Amino acid sequence: KYSTFLDLYDSFGVYVADDELSKSYAKAYGVDTLYQYQHGGLPNIACEWPTSSYLNFTLLTATAYSIFAPSNTAINHFFDNFWKVGGYSSLGEVDPLALNYFLYQFIYGGSLVFPEEIGTGKLESLLGSPININPAMLNEKIMCVNGALYGMNEIQEPSAFASVVGPLFQYRDARSFLYALGGSSLISSYTSNLVKYIMLVPTADQ
């Protein structure tokens, strides 16, 4: 039911050598190095613990993730109404940076979100943009060892994608400007709903 979301997330998966794990456990396995599966550029939601250092007690006990996972149907519907309009013919063609920002819109990091907090308008994604979630759309509520998973059958347009920089995520021919703006670390400034902007977006050819 949520395999598309998982596949998109796993498309950023990498195995990273972990010195802490290697020092503690590699010898017991008869190897020199142990690797940890992480998601490059995204929160490592596949890891039970936020750090492999058992000495970092504060981080181990305080960090959790809350994921609002759209169903396969919801993602397909969003693709048809957003990315297909922007010139993409399939989800597999969507630019990785646009997908990265898309996934971030459904992650609340740092602490656990309880059901009564959803829909209050106070939740922000890890990128600092408001999380637009209608509690009535949630059909799965699962507590996990490292946070909470909420499943939903519909997607309200993510706030960053409805902002002035939304066309950068949507249109294929705006990808060059998306990377330029992303490299400047200014995207989060333009997704704020506290200020109004007018943005002129050059195409790749320009």
Label each region the model flagged:
Residues 1-206:
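Mature, structured domains of secreted/extracytosolic soluble proteins
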